[in-house]
Curated annotation (Swiss-Prot):
Organism encoding this protein: Gluconacetobacter diazotrophicus (strain ATCC 49037 / DSM 5601 / CCUG 37298 / CIP 103539 / LMG 7603 / PAl5)
Residue numbers annotated as active site: K17, D154
Protein name: 4-diphosphocytidyl-2-C-methyl-D-erythritol kinase
Highest taxon of source: Bacteria
Residues that hold ATP according to the record: P111, V112, A113, S114, G115, I116, G117, G118, G119, S120, A121
Amino acid sequence: MTDPTGTGTLHESAHAKINLYLHVTGRRPDGYHLLDSLAVFAGAADRLTLRPGAAGQGEAVALDIAGAFGAGLVADTDSNLVLQAARRLRAEMGVTDRLAPMRIVLEKSLPVASGIGGGSADAAAALRLLLRAWPGEALPRARLMALAVELGADVPVCIDQRAARMGGVGERLAPAPALPNCGMMLVNCGEAVPTPAVFRARAPVFTPAASLPSAWPDVGAMVRDLAALTNDLQDAACELCPTIRTVLQVLDAAPGCRLARMSGSGATCFALFDSPQGARDAMTAVERPGWWVWAGGLHGMPAET
């Protein structure tokens, strides 16, 4: 295990994936829906730590789950995408019998099953951790991305945690427009909205793929273009969970909000602001009992303009 700190541990962050818009463009013969979306990553993140495991732990890579949203996942760690990613990577690299035991600790700070790709981001972070831990084992980029697709359509975009245009069922990635350093607020009302139910409830119509510029010079230009687009799952999710509509109304009324919309299939909603500090300043106007609220900037951007 490569560990420049000498502590025997490695760390990765798994950032929230936000769909700034999401068009359902069609449906494949196998029933999977085709999408066009612009995904960005917020500063909000889960944290994964990889450390040496115990000889008798039973599996080459074991998983512990903690954090504010970890309790709901502890009962079913065996099916967690983090462990699935570890198992598939071991098989793909063909090193199963040569691995020292390791343990991943997932600190779950993001709401579960909430439209922000948390499980997919965790799986991608696990892949990055293990590839750092096994530096002598080469894995071509194409094979890594193919493995990511097998884990889930959102996992490929989470590998690099960079803004990207998503197509196909989500696995086809293309460069995103250059983004301004905007602020973002995320709100989750604490109510689960199953993705299959949202797709079943949506109107049976399709929306063409969007036409985007190569760059947005400022937040105003970005908001004007995004306002002309939609999240095609938002209305259906609001019918299933009316609190989402309340969240959107509260966000839209927040001081400095430029755009409010639902991410993915919900229930997390986001609002865009002129700056990260502007988003943080508006938090007190949005916070409600039982709501998870985060405010800041986009991952990879300066914290302030």
